[in-house]
Amino acid sequence: MDAQYNPRTVEEVFRDFKGRRAGLVRALTADVEDFFRQCDPEKENLCLYGFPNEHWEVNLPAEEVPPELPEPALGINFARDGMQEKDWLSMVAVHSDAWLLSVAFYFGARFGFDKNDRKRLFGMINDLPTIFEVVSGKSKAKPPSANNHSNSKSKSSNKTKSSEPRAKQPKPQPQPPVKNEGREEEGGPDDEEGGGGGGGGREEEHGETLCGACGESYGADEFWICCDICEKWFHGKCVKITPAKAEHIKQYKCPSCSGGNGGGGGGSGNGKRARPS
């Protein structure tokens, strides 16, 4: 509607943006009754225009195809009576925000703004609350630093969680895990079969466990052993237990549970739980 006005620098485009934005905000706030009245659903497709001089207008779209400037949302009047007024105004505000950006970056593209120009223009625009934020009362946004910190923390947390299953996949154990000799005797052969089905769940649980001595997580090529007293897992190297030595330990006790003597146990068999290296 005002194609003759062509700002050519970042500052001029931003000034154009602010003027159009001010007009649209006025239409949806201070002049809302007049704006509501002009958007008659009985009329043809209507658009809300904002101008650099901070005025606004409800009018038909430009006749030329394609138009000289990007056009705002078409037919905003048709939805007026089919929605709550607050929701309708919010919908118009969202479309107006999109239109303002399209006009600003149309000028940027037309007059050859480079990467730094576009970045600076967007930064200047982004410092202002959107029309939707003004109309909906959400213009008091959180400080950018707080949002960036929250987003960074969330992304970091998601990245860590998604990578954990790949980093902690345990190797298949050569035999089903054995809880202890007493429970096996009570459960009998049937319980051993059921235990085989639960082994995968135990591996998954231990894949998230940290070493009770050094606090590090499980590595796929490391030998681990579990204390049958406190149920904590340890790197074999941290408690000085090798796979060969573990084969001769019936019930393993970590250094804390065995009084600090380096851990161990008596007898033969395979009652302890261990992860192969």
Swiss-Prot record:
Q: Where is this site: Histone H3K4me3 binding?
A: Y218, W224, D228, W233
- In residue numbers, the region (Disordered) covers 138-206, 255-277
| Keyword flag Zinc | yes
Q: What molecular function terms (GO) are annotated for this protein? A: histone binding; transcription cis-regulatory region binding; transcription coregulator activity; zinc ion binding
Q: Which CDD domains match?
A: PHD_AL_plant
Compositional bias (Low complexity): 145-160
User: Which InterPro entries does its entry note?
Assistant: Alfin, Alfin_N, PHD_AL_plant, Zinc_finger_PHD-type_CS, Znf_FYVE_PHD, Znf_PHD, Znf_PHD-finger, Znf_RING/FYVE/PHD
Q: Does the keyword Transport apply?
A: no
In terms of PROSITE patterns, this protein maps to: ZF_PHD_1, ZF_PHD_2
GO-annotated biological processes: chromatin organization; regulation of DNA-templated transcription
Q: Which GO terms describe its cellular component?
A: nucleus
Alphabetical keyword list:
Chromatin regulator, Metal-binding, Nucleus, Transcription, Transcription regulation, Zinc, Zinc-finger
Q: Where in the cell is it found?
A: Nucleus
SMART domains per UniProt: PHD
Pfam families per the UniProt record, alphabetical = Alfin (PF12165), PHD (PF00628)
Q: Where are the PHD-type-classified zinc fingers?
A: 208-260
Which intervals carry biased composition (Gly residues)? 259-270
The family this protein is said to belong to = Belongs to the Alfin family.
Q: What does this protein do?
A: Histone-binding component that specifically recognizes H3 tails trimethylated on 'Lys-4' (H3K4me3), which mark transcription start sites of virtually all active genes.
Q: How does it assemble?
A: Interacts with H3K4me3 and to a lesser extent with H3K4me2.
Domain comment (free text)? The PHD-type zinc finger mediates the binding to H3K4me3.
Task: Tell me the protein's name.
Answer: PHD finger protein ALFIN-LIKE 9
Q: Which organism is it from?
A: Oryza sativa subsp. indica (Rice)
